[in-house]
Each structure stands twice: as C-alpha cells, then as structure tokens.
C-alpha cells in the first residue's frame, strides 16, 4: 500500500470567482511545473463558493508543501480564501489499493 499522501485543500471563495480561478490556476500550474504534482480544482455541488484543490499521491511532501506555499504567495491566491485554506492529508487504506 502506498504511503504517499494525497492533499485536499478546501476554502470558501472570497472575491471575484474569475479572478480567483485565474490566480489558483496559475498557482497550480507552477506547482505542476516545479514539483511534478498535477492538481485539480473542484467546487461543491451544493455550494459553489466552496472550492477544493486536490493533489494526489505526493511523493515528496516537504518539497510539495514548500512549492505550494511559494506559488500561493507568488500568485496572491490566499486573498481568495475567506477564513483561510484548510489542508487535509490522506493516505490509501482500502482493500483494493495497490500494495
């Protein structure tokens, strides 16, 4: 079973959604280029002002977290998170997960 964590970063949208999407997309692109972790941006079906970034199977959490923090700062994406960004880390534990 893999021990590489997946990151789930959720927050409530603050400000203009188009501007936020541009900043977050640029941030995620930097993360993908700089450390090879491709993220996905999602929103809740019942509350489109709640967004989540998903980064799966992060092999080097220290480098990933540093790169994410730098990209977050560079693109000013934190300004679009009302109440801050909530970061959660999960690892696979299911019977069908690859060992």
Q: What annotation goes with each model-predicted range?
A:
Residues 1-50, 55-69, 86-99:
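Short S/T/G/P-rich N-terminal loop/turn motif that feeds into the first structured element of a domain
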């Amino acid at each position: 079973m893999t021990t590489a964590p997946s990151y789930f970063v959720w927050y409530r949208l603050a400000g203009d959604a188009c501007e936020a999407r541009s900043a977050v997309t640029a941030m995620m692109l930097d993360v993908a280029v700089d450390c090879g972790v491709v993220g996905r941006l999602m929103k809740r079906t019942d509350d489109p002002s709640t967004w989540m970034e998903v980064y799966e199977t992060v092999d080097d959490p220290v480098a990933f977290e540093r790169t994410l923090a730098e990209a977050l700062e560079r693109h000013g994406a934190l300004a679009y998170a009302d109440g801050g960004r909530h970061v959660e880390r999960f690892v696979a534990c299911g019977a069908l997960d690859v060992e």
